[in-house]
């Protein structure tokens, strides 16, 4: 039986309404976030002890942060530690709650009279609120946040940092929204916080994402809400009311682990005309691995052994696993068009173009007879990405990696631009 980890816990760094943060003496740059058995509403104007809430909240946060980390979102989460706590990189918190909304409800309707409940935002609407309990967390504009000239862990919060947090908020919401859909749950809105990692000086998703952080409606039906709004809506807090709230929280905790899996299988099969193309194919396989997609390599020639090519095709069609075929053949590419003409599965041609005859060879992948729907992508990484986009339509884990990759590319460009501008000053 595994021995429970013994932590050398230091001083309390912070205490909030529902959690405490402690330093870890043996792990500089790491902290312990300990959840409480407490539920609050209205900036703690209403608060109650709720036995078991700490474990529920910790489970939800740990699963959600794991999901986001595996997708590629930078997150202040190291690992779950016991039932009610987790270890995370130490951050200096930015005192802004970022809210992302798909459906208009709650406080948005009060602040925007005339908007009807249920109005849908395309894209999701991002708002920010300054954390100030005494003033009920007032809504802030982008300009107010920049004018505040906050500095955390040596990082000044300017236009670049605000843009990064805004884009990250939308991406995180969309990943979680997509992840809840297979459970027939609508993510209505969500609030998150960011911090600056004291070690890396990077902005990361921090704090927690638990059942206090969102509105979650099974079947898109508000009357079935399973989030903290069920506690806010209690006219009077009674033991029976708290038990109902706890059951709602347990309902979410029971399902959140399912977000880490997908019921939709996927597979890429790379067909190469010759082992001389193996290096090209290995790049495709590696890129597929980055999206969590299993990839198999096979050798077959549609010119020299069409019967074997079609036998291999039938082998993969016969096991019921959704498959994208990638054909890798230089010179005269018969492999991609022959496969495409004989299967209803998607086929991508990814010819290894060479400098000498490449300009001529590529036409065998581009000029095709009618009835052939074979796409052509020259980049090995690009062909894997296109396969991922096909699978991402029905696999939220693949889609999450694609969405996080898009965000991270945008952030890297934004940071590169900031660095260049600073060099020019």
UniProtKB/Swiss-Prot annotation:
<dbReference type="InterPro" id="IPR028923">
    <property type="entry name" value="SAICAR_synt/ADE2_N"/>
</dbReference>
<feature type="modified residue" description="N6-acetyllysine">
    <location>
        <position position="36"/>
    </location>
</feature>
<keyword id="KW-0547">Nucleotide-binding</keyword>
<feature type="modified residue" description="Phosphoserine">
    <location>
        <position position="107"/>
    </location>
</feature>
<comment type="pathway">
    <text>Purine metabolism; IMP biosynthesis via de novo pathway; 5-amino-1-(5-phospho-D-ribosyl)imidazole-4-carboxylate from 5-amino-1-(5-phospho-D-ribosyl)imidazole (carboxylase route): step 1/1.</text>
</comment>
<dbReference type="GO" id="GO:0044208">
    <property type="term" value="P:'de novo' AMP biosynthetic process"/>
</dbReference>
<dbReference type="GO" id="GO:0005524">
    <property type="term" value="F:ATP binding"/>
</dbReference>
<comment type="similarity">
    <text>In the N-terminal section; belongs to the SAICAR synthetase family.</text>
</comment>
<dbReference type="GO" id="GO:0009113">
    <property type="term" value="P:purine nucleobase biosynthetic process"/>
</dbReference>
<dbReference type="GO" id="GO:0004639">
    <property type="term" value="F:phosphoribosylaminoimidazolesuccinocarboxamide synthase activity"/>
</dbReference>
<feature type="modified residue" description="N6-acetyllysine">
    <location>
        <position position="247"/>
    </location>
</feature>
<keyword id="KW-0007">Acetylation</keyword>
<keyword id="KW-0511">Multifunctional enzyme</keyword>
<dbReference type="InterPro" id="IPR000031">
    <property type="entry name" value="PurE_dom"/>
</dbReference>
<feature type="modified residue" description="Phosphoserine">
    <location>
        <position position="27"/>
    </location>
</feature>
<keyword id="KW-0658">Purine biosynthesis</keyword>
<dbReference type="Pfam" id="PF00731">
    <property type="entry name" value="AIRC"/>
</dbReference>
<comment type="subunit">
    <text>Homooctamer.</text>
</comment>
<dbReference type="GO" id="GO:0042802">
    <property type="term" value="F:identical protein binding"/>
</dbReference>
<dbReference type="InterPro" id="IPR033626">
    <property type="entry name" value="PurE_classII"/>
</dbReference>
<feature type="region of interest" description="AIR carboxylase domain">
    <location>
        <begin position="267"/>
        <end position="425"/>
    </location>
</feature>
<keyword id="KW-0456">Lyase</keyword>
<dbReference type="InterPro" id="IPR050089">
    <property type="entry name" value="SAICAR_synthetase"/>
</dbReference>
<dbReference type="Pfam" id="PF01259">
    <property type="entry name" value="SAICAR_synt"/>
</dbReference>
<dbReference type="GO" id="GO:0006189">
    <property type="term" value="P:'de novo' IMP biosynthetic process"/>
</dbReference>
<dbReference type="GO" id="GO:0006177">
    <property type="term" value="P:GMP biosynthetic process"/>
</dbReference>
<dbReference type="GO" id="GO:0004638">
    <property type="term" value="F:phosphoribosylaminoimidazole carboxylase activity"/>
</dbReference>
<feature type="region of interest" description="Linker">
    <location>
        <begin position="261"/>
        <end position="266"/>
    </location>
</feature>
<feature type="modified residue" description="N-acetylalanine">
    <location>
        <position position="2"/>
    </location>
</feature>
<dbReference type="GO" id="GO:0000082">
    <property type="term" value="P:G1/S transition of mitotic cell cycle"/>
</dbReference>
<keyword id="KW-0210">Decarboxylase</keyword>
<feature type="region of interest" description="SAICAR synthetase domain">
    <location>
        <begin position="2"/>
        <end position="260"/>
    </location>
</feature>
<comment type="pathway">
    <text>Purine metabolism; IMP biosynthesis via de novo pathway; 5-amino-1-(5-phospho-D-ribosyl)imidazole-4-carboxamide from 5-amino-1-(5-phospho-D-ribosyl)imidazole-4-carboxylate: step 1/2.</text>
</comment>
<comment type="function">
    <text>Bifunctional phosphoribosylaminoimidazole carboxylase and phosphoribosylaminoimidazole succinocarboxamide synthetase catalyzing two reactions of the de novo purine biosynthetic pathway.</text>
</comment>
<dbReference type="InterPro" id="IPR018236">
    <property type="entry name" value="SAICAR_synthetase_CS"/>
</dbReference>
<keyword id="KW-0436">Ligase</keyword>
<keyword id="KW-0597">Phosphoprotein</keyword>
<comment type="similarity">
    <text>In the C-terminal section; belongs to the AIR carboxylase family. Class II subfamily.</text>
</comment>
<feature type="binding site">
    <location>
        <position position="332"/>
    </location>
    <ligand>
        <name>CO2</name>
    </ligand>
</feature>
<protein>
    <recommendedName>
        <fullName>Bifunctional phosphoribosylaminoimidazole carboxylase/phosphoribosylaminoimidazole succinocarboxamide synthetase</fullName>
        <ecNumber>4.1.1.21</ecNumber>
        <ecNumber>6.3.2.6</ecNumber>
    </recommendedName>
</protein>
<feature type="modified residue" description="Phosphotyrosine">
    <location>
        <position position="22"/>
    </location>
</feature>
<dbReference type="GO" id="GO:0005737">
    <property type="term" value="C:cytoplasm"/>
</dbReference>
């Amino acid at each position: 039986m595994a021995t429970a980890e013994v932590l050398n816990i230091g001083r309390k760094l912070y205490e909030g309404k529902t959690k405490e943060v402690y330093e870890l003496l043996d792990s500089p740059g790491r902290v312990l976030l300990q959840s409480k058995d407490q539920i609050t509403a209205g900036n703690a104007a209403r608060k109650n002890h709720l036995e078991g809430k700490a474990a529920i909240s910790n489970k939800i946060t740990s699963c959600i942060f794991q999901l986001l980390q595996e997708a590629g979102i930078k997150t202040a989460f190291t690992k779950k530690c016991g039932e009610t706590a987790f270890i995370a990189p130490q951050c200096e918190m930015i005192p802004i709650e970022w809210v992302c909304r798909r459906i208009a409800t709650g406080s948005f309707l009060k602040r925007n009279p005339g908007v009807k409940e249920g109005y849908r935002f395309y894209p999701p609407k991002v708002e920010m609120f300054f954390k100030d309990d005494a003033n009920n967390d007032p809504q802030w504009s982008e300009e107010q946040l920049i004018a505040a000239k906050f500095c955390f862990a040596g990082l000044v919060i300017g236009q670049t940092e605000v843009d990064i947090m805004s884009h990250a908020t939308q991406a995180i919401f969309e990943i979680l929204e997509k992840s809840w859909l297979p459970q027939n749950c609508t993510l209505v809105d969500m609030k998150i916080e960011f911090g600056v990692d004291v070690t890396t000086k990077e902005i990361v998703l921090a704090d927690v994402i638990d059942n206090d952080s969102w509105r979650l409606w099974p079947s898109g039906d508000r009357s079935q809400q399973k989030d903290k709004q069920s506690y806010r809506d209690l006219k009077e807090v009674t033991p029976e009311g708290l038990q109902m709230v706890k059951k709602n929280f347990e309902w979410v905790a029971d399902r959140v682990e399912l977000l880490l899996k997908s019921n939709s299988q996927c597979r890429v099969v790379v067909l190469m005309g010759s082992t001389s193309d193996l290096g090209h194919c290995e790049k495709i396989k590696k890129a597929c691995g980055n999206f969590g997609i299993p990839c198999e390599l096979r050798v077959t020639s549609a010119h020299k052994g069409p019967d074997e090519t079609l036998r291999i095709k039938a082998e993969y069609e016969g096991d019921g696993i959704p498959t994208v075929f990638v054909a890798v053949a230089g010179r005269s590419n018969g492999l991609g068009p022959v496969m495409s003409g004989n299967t209803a599965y998607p086929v991508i041609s990814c010819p290894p173009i060479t400098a000498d005859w490449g300009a001529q060879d590529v036409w065998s992948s581009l000029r095709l007879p009618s009835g052939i729907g074979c796409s052509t992508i020259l980049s090995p990484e690009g062909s894997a990405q296109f396969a991922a986009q096909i699978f991402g339509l029905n696999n939220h884990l693949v889609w999450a990696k694609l969405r996080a990759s898009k965000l991270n590319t945008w952030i890297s460009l934004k940071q590169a631009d900031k660095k260049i501008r600073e060099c020019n000053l």
